[in-house]
Amino acid sequence: MTTKTLPTLSMQQKNLLLEATRTIAPHWPLDKLIAVNPLWSLVDKPFDDISDELSALAGIKTYMSNETYRAWFDEGKISHHCLTKAAEHYGLNEQDALLEHLSQANNLPDSWRNIADLADQQRPANKMSWHDEITHQVSQFCAAHYQQQSPTLRQQNIDNELDLYSHWLEVTNEDKGLSIVMGEAKLTKFFHNLPTDKDALFALVIEELALDDQSLSFFAKALLLDINGWSSYLAYLNWSKGENNDNLAKDDHVESLLAIKMAWELVVWRYLKHTAPALLSTINTKWMAQKQAIPNLIQAHKDALITSKVWALALEYSEQKSLNQTLTTEPAHNTTQTRPELQAIFCIDVRSEVFRRALEQQSATIQTLGFAGFFGLPIEYKAKDSHYVRPQLPGLLQAAITVTESDSDKGHVHHQQKEARWYRWGHAAPAAFSMVESMGWWYAFKMFKQTLFSKRQEHPANRLAPNTHWQLTQQGVLLTDQDKAHLAKGILDTIKLTTYAPIVMLVGHGSHTSNNLHAAGLECGACGGQSGEVNVRVLASLLNDHKVRTLLNDMGMEIPSDTQFVPALHNTTTDQLTCFDQTKDAKPIDRKIKDWFEKAQFLAQQERAAKLDTALLDASDKQRSKAFSKRANDWSQVNPEWGLANNHSFIIAPRQKTRHLDLEGRSFLHDYDPQNDPDFAILERILTAPMLVTHWINMQYNLSVTDNFKFGCGNKVLHNAVGGNIGVFEGNGGDLRIGLSMQSLNDGQKWMHTPVRLAVYVTAPKSAIEKIAAKHDIVKHLIDNDWLYLFQWEDNKVARFYQQEWHAEK
């Protein structure tokens, strides 16, 4: 008797599978939620090509429907000139019939079908869909496996931590319910014959499904995109392990998920081969034909999408033309050379633009600046006497310094810890009903009280004690005064203040909402999805420190002795600005400055009311402000603010060039003056860090609009938290949902975000921009592969840098 030799996985096949897992971009958990370009791992290829492939792979949409674009054209949002220009770009020159041609619905061909999908085409209507049950089973298993509060699945050997695939196989082999749900009596036994080793499984699938290199790559990508939510979260786990220098050999999470999906495909194939050979023969015919036609499939989708691409480009051209005219037709604001009364440094966030403009209207002696919201501090925050630690910097970076309150009184710490325990209990997935049940009438009263008399809810770690001093450590060692001075100098060198006002406000931002699982997504993305309060408090503490000031002076950085750095927080939901006293002996904020802030708040609220609630436009300032606060605290409110919706540009220039302009809260604003940057090192940092963050934000909003099913999270009302902070389900099943909810994008009547790729405007010499793009592949990819637009804005002229050439905008 001869034993059949099992197939082995070649290095080429292993690399193709690895490459497929690396195409998935990470998605951060709810408590650290930041915006991410869901296609970040693919920016080394042209955007149009990726759009064609994603459409062919999984029916993913990166453009709006032609009907939507045509409606925007009829509204005047897309100009005929820009439409013609976009059509010429794609080789469509039939001017007379152009509009009629572009207005036709783009009938897309079918997308790739996995084995389960092909089986469903022949499945009786009274039976559970293979695809739906696979998604449900895998998704529910992942939720249980990665449950953060407490494990909900047992393992046979608790001392031997299983990887995702091995644990799934162990649990599934004991799951008799699958056969019942699917109405397939013998289904479960087909899992018993699956190999426990992932590579052995991959080799079996490749052999039995007759996959060559091209179809293997396509198949693997399609399977991961089919459960893109969990793929993205597991990519985050891989990323976080890699950033912490942990070895992925223990468990590459995305690879394990791919193994589970392939295992299901193999089980369906083998099961039908055993129980319905005629049906499998039909499926095999389609499968073989599909594999051989992959290039044709992509080409068919490319051809079908051409009209959508023209419309999308025309929309971008139209938006850019309007902004170009705004930037070049008005003279720059002439700022006074005298010392300002007040300087306020804000985050570059688009929501800051509205408030900055309102604040500047109060006096010509006010100067505002834009800077990355983490204020250059590479920190993580550790709550005092607690194990709770969270990053306070962009997701792309790793914290080098830990900050902790050094003088919080014991009463405050005890209260904070008690609130944290209550918060964890109330937010744990299994606790929702047991909490109400065990607390009985008292909790019912609390819920009733919150409904009638709502108040601000926040994580206990955000309730910092007043007048806090900070302890800064690096790898457990306290920073010396010299270390602090060097840290402060590096930040001030980047901000490049040429003069210092008596009051310099360091304004972080945060969003205060109630009953909002995605609250972190409205916080400061540059602070890792947290409020910027810790960052501004720590930096103000450093810059007000007498010893640090003395050392800075010795380094040649003279700060006037009467200059006080004041930490503040801009509440983006209510547009209230709160100042924090850094020390007990700090000078009180002048009444005039407080009045400026209040008037700016009223102006900003009036502007935002037009989009949030038009009924508030006729209200008094006080009534409107009260309504904004009520809206923020209302736990039934699904749309407390519009966040960064409708962002479309990033302007890197001196503020005096835009101070006179109404940019409608759509532009990220980063102060930059090339005259203060002789070696262009600051510009290089901006183009390789903040620009990437703004691109991530822009693409998350764009793709959440164009395909909310794959890249958005659907209806917020139906959300249920998964495993603590992992993410959300829409309802009680399906894939993990990522991205933005419909309530963050659409007011029920129209889209509040226009999906256009980011336009970046830089005031700097062309040669400097060219050198930075040539030096950094990621910058070059974003520009030349059409993931964003890069313009030079100089002397009231705009020129686009693309494919290593400059093109004047007309």
Swiss-Prot record:
Membrane-topology descriptor: Peripheral membrane protein
Intracellular or extracellular location(s): Cell inner membrane
Residues that coordinate or bind Zn(2+): 347, 349, 509, 524
GO molecular function: zinc ion binding
Cofactor(s) recorded in Swiss-Prot or TrEMBL: Zn(2+)
Highest taxon of source: Bacteria
Iron-sulfur listed as a keyword: no
Pfam families: DabA
Record's keyword terms, sorted: Cell inner membrane, Cell membrane, Membrane, Metal-binding, Transport, Zinc
Keyword Zinc belongs to the record: yes
GO CC annotations, alphabetized: plasma membrane
InterPro entries attached to this UniProt entry: DabA
Main localization, broad class: membrane
Functional description taken from the UniProt entry: Part of an energy-coupled inorganic carbon pump.
Record-stated family: Belongs to the inorganic carbon transporter (TC 9.A.2) DabA family.
Subunit structure: Forms a complex with DabB.
Protein name: Probable inorganic carbon transporter subunit DabA
Species: Marinomonas sp. (strain MWYL1)
Gene: dabA
